Amino acid sequence: VYSELEQGASFKVYLPRYVGTSETTDVESRQNMKPARGSETILLVEDESAIRRLLTELLKYSGFTILQADNGVEALQVADQHAGPIHLLITDIVMPQMSGRVLAEQLIVRRPDMKVLYISGYEANAIVHQGILDEGAPFLPKPFSNDALLKKIHKLLNLPPEPDS
């Protein structure tokens, strides 16, 4: 740490170099990804626009039809306007206007066959402990890899696993 009065401070952190072998990066994983075999429709509800755009791109590339909304109120409107089935709701848990849990509860009444996957930047234990989500509910903590998301989706929708490249 180096500091000068009215000039600020600088911090230098030295980390050891990683000498192991690297795993496949998300970019490499995405390049090798095979599209899903089905034509399922997913309603993606995420209040962070950058995350919503990235997930939409990934899921479309993987063969899914994507409906999207940036909050629960908008998601209810999108779902009501969509005549076909919605196979999966992927929703952030903590959002303005309406939580992901309340959204899911309302949509399941209208679409009882729809599956739900909750995503959040909060840890699963904290969410369950606070009563925000029931223990055992399908949940994926952020950040997550493309592969982890696709595996979870395939499991929830009973799709065959993504082929390995």
List each language-model region with its residue ranges.
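C-terminal end segment of the histidine kinase catalytic
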Residues: 1-42, 49, 73, 115-118, ...
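Two-component His->Asp phosphorelay active-site signatures
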Residues: 47-49, 145
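Charged docking surfaces used in two-component/phosphorelay signaling
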Residues: 53-61
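Acidic, metal-coordinating helix/loop segments flanking the phosphotransfer/catalytic sites
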Residues: 56, 68-88
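Acidic catalytic/metal-coordinating carboxylates
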Residues: 71-74, 99-103
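Active-site residues of response regulator receiver
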Residues: 92
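Receiver (REC) domain active-site loop signature in two-component systems and cognate sites
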Residues: 95
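Alpha4 helix (beta4-alpha4-beta5 surface) of REC/receiver domains from two-component response regulators
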Residues: 102, 106-141, 146-155
